[in-house]
Amino acid sequence: MANVTLYKQDGSENGKVELNDAIWAVEPNENVVFDAVVMQRASLRQGTHAVKNRSAVSGGGRKPWRQKGTGRARQGSIRSPQWRGGGIVFGPTPRSYAYKLPKKVRRLAIKSVLSQKVLDSDLVVVDGLNFDAPKTKAFATVLDGLKVSDKALVVLEDGNEVAAKAARNLPNVKVVPAEGINVLDVVDYKKLILTQSALQKIEEVLA
């Protein structure tokens, strides 16, 4: 099994931690990762676009002129699509863009991006992130000790609200629970910082 350095909160080394090869040593599949990112971004779309068709636009209930005898083209409503201010034909309607990839594909995608972090030496495992109070400065000090200056995704165990609040004002840091780790976030952030408890939770879910 592969292993990475385990760090203390102050940035000093605290031995090694073993990684499950079935999760962290998978050959990255770029096509699957791309599909997963597109799926997640599609689900983020609001899909609230809408226009008025001729049944929704106001007015136009009366025939503008008689059918015959005027010399003009016959018209039934001033809200027909060919009129200025008329209804739109086949316009966009509210819809959901969300869809799901097969479960095996989604799992391969998350394993691929996690394995890529190991290959790129962008995985940082900390034995714990414990703070007396949710202070942004305290969390920034931890990042300095870990020598993390890039965008960082911090994955915490459940219930660590103090650490989550301490990090939320840092501009290049995002905090997610272990159950909420996803392909899009891992791809978007350069460094992946895990607590040891979060690492165990991820391996329980994905193993």
Curated annotation (Swiss-Prot):
BP GO terms, sorted: translation
Keyword annotations of the record: Ribonucleoprotein, Ribosomal protein, RNA-binding, rRNA-binding
Top-level taxon: Bacteria
Keyword Hydrolase included in the entry's annotation: no
Pfam families: Ribosomal_L4
Chain segments annotated as coiled-coil in the UniProt record: none
Disordered: region residues: 49-86
InterPro entries (UniProt xref): Ribosomal_uL4, Ribosomal_uL4-like, Ribosomal_uL4_dom_sf
Keyword RNA-binding tagged: yes
UniProt subunit comment: Part of the 50S ribosomal subunit.
HAMAP family: Ribosomal_uL4_B
PANTHER family noted in UniProt: 50S RIBOSOMAL PROTEIN L4, LARGE RIBOSOMAL SUBUNIT PROTEIN UL4M
Role this protein plays: One of the primary rRNA binding proteins, this protein initially binds near the 5'-end of the 23S rRNA. It is important during the early stages of 50S assembly. It makes multiple contacts with different domains of the 23S rRNA in the assembled 50S subunit and ribosome. Forms part of the polypeptide exit tunnel.
Family named by the database record: Belongs to the universal ribosomal protein uL4 family.
Protein name: Large ribosomal subunit protein uL4
